Amino acid sequence: KHKFENGFEFEIKIKKGSGAFVCGEETSLMASIEGVRAMPRPKPPFPANSGLFKKPTNINNVETLAAVSSIMRDGAASYAALGSEKSKGTKTFSLAGKIQRTGLIEVEFGMKLGDIINSIGGGCADGRKFKAVQTGGPSGGCLTIEHMDLPVDYESLGSVGTIIGSGGMVVMNEDSCMVDVAKFFVSFTENESCGKCVPCRMGTQHIHAILEKITSGKGEMADIERLKKIAFTMKQSSLC
């Protein structure tokens, strides 16, 4: 317990999770803390009304709480002076893949993608040509050389069909097979699917099978339409 001068007390409890990917979704995380199987819940009700143990809940990740401490210390105006017009502040990204300098970086929202890849990351390793960068984790999308002038913020990435997500950036070079990359991430989501939503549970399996078929040299143009149809159904029908 921590006691302040005004007599306010609160308890901090640390609960260890098993690292399930689905627990990145807030209602799944609360289910895990409650001791039941981690599965997403329909919203509404939202956590602010009915969250952990059906009580009003303020649920945020560590990066948000770190930003709150900065705002409390330096004021909201100081924090809002950083970033882009709609995405204020900074974001931590994890640079990985075929890039010279990997690691964690913190940049202002609105920095151009090319500046992150080339100025901070040093460009592709071994003098290879840049092909794409996958953003937003397994559920994100890929950006190519034509997106180098794109500001990295929520609105700009959303406008081209990808997300910031947890801040992952995996760089691919000219030697990378994008179908293999897609198959790798789909294999992960297939294994990590909680199984609650049929479109996700079955869709990831079907997409993985189609990508396996393509990479084995047996693909056909009709497979592309099947992939689009399954992906659309999953996006429209799955909870998270």
Predicted regions and their residues:
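Ferredoxin-type iron-sulfur electron-transfer modules in oxidoreductases and energy-metabolism complexes
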Residues: K1-N6, I145-L239
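Short amphipathic, charge-patterned alpha-helical segments
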Residues: F109-A125
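A generic structural signal for well-ordered coil/turn residues at beta-strand boundaries
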Residues: F8, G89, R101, K129, ...
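Extended, hydrophobic alpha-helical segments in both membrane/secreted and soluble proteins
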Residues: L113-I116, K129, S193, I207
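Terminal amphipathic helices with adjacent charged low-complexity linkers/tails
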Residues: K1, F10-I12, C124-S159
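Hydrophobic alpha-helical positions that pack around
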Residues: K1-F109, G121
